[in-house]
Amino acid sequence: MTLEFTKEIKKAKATNKIKKIVDTRTKYEEYLNNPNYVQLVYPDEITFSLFNQLNNAANDNREFNRFFISQSNHWIYLGNDQTNEIYQVKIAGANFDKLRKYACNAKSKYPVRLVRLKEGYSPFYIKTMNAKVYSYLTNHQSYSYFVSRLLGTSGVTSKTNKNGQTVYSLNYYTRLRVPDSNSGEHNYLYTHYEKNKIPNTTNRLLDSVYYVHQLGLTEQDLRFFDADGANVSYLNYIEGIPVFLNKHDLQVKTTFSTDSINVAFNSVNFQIPIPFDGQTKRLKPTQDVVDELVNHGLKQEDIQRIIVGFAEEKDSSHHSLINLIPTYYIKAYDEWKSLGEWEKQDVSTYREADQLTVNEGGK
């Protein structure tokens, strides 16, 4: 569906100015719950500037995270879960008939209700699900591949620290830290030092895409996943579901500051899918999960997002075989963790730290 939408939205041209038509929660939720719209949702806000053909303005930093596809090919609606705003755009050149057909004939359909959390509306699964467990053979690009792509092949120096990590440098401004080859770790950190202002939202998104392409992670379905302040993150998606690494790590995370750009990434490549063997994982209704977290001390109003993602699990039958286990992941206090991890945390320490931050901000 996402590929079909992307293909058609690239053809769309706005034939009039963007018009705000909704700015209240009540009206916004009427659109959310209207079955006549096909909704495509970004995991976090993006800006109008990324869709110049829809507004003819390269510096429009208004944000949205949700497309509403109506029954007409002449109108499209852009929604912002945070502000309850919906914008109407009259368009020409796009045909979403196939998209509507795909949505109508989808093989997997689960009843959900949309619940407002701290960062917007999350789909809450109403019934227990038996979600498929997938398996993949994985591999990793060599460190020399990333050194060559990110630093080049000449003028590069290296220095190994006592932890076995090696830092490759190109002049004083660009570095790549690679893991110890004997550690079994595959986490890299690329740093480019540059005095600059932290870019605005649009440029952070565009710059992060540039660095993702620079990495050259092969055969991946990397997608935009999250944006917090100066950070923009990406995850690999399999069967439309995000894959978390090392319990809760993101595959690529770009961080912008006034003196550098950092790109932390993992080199894992989910290369060969293993035929589905019928294994499933039982997932509770989402509200039951939230109730468990509340009983553990994590208030619902502190939950930013909740999704179903894949957790990695090594298969004992082969050193490169990974099982992808469907698991609830929850974002709270700006941290992503699985349900099991949050249930083991002393949530009061997070709450106290969060309150301290709020108090300091109010001084």
Where in this protein do the model-derived segments appear?
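A short local loop/turn or secondary-structure capping micro-motif enriched for an aromatic residue
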Residues: E85-Q88, F96-D97, Q271-P275, V347-T349
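Short, non-transmembrane alpha-helical segments in secretory-pathway proteins
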Residues: Y193-A230, F276-S317
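Conserved histidines in hydrophobic membrane contexts and catalytic metal-binding motifs
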Residues: S208, T254, P326-D334, L339-D354, ...
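Extracytoplasmic/periplasmic membrane-proximal domains and adjacent transmembrane bundles
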Residues: T357-N359
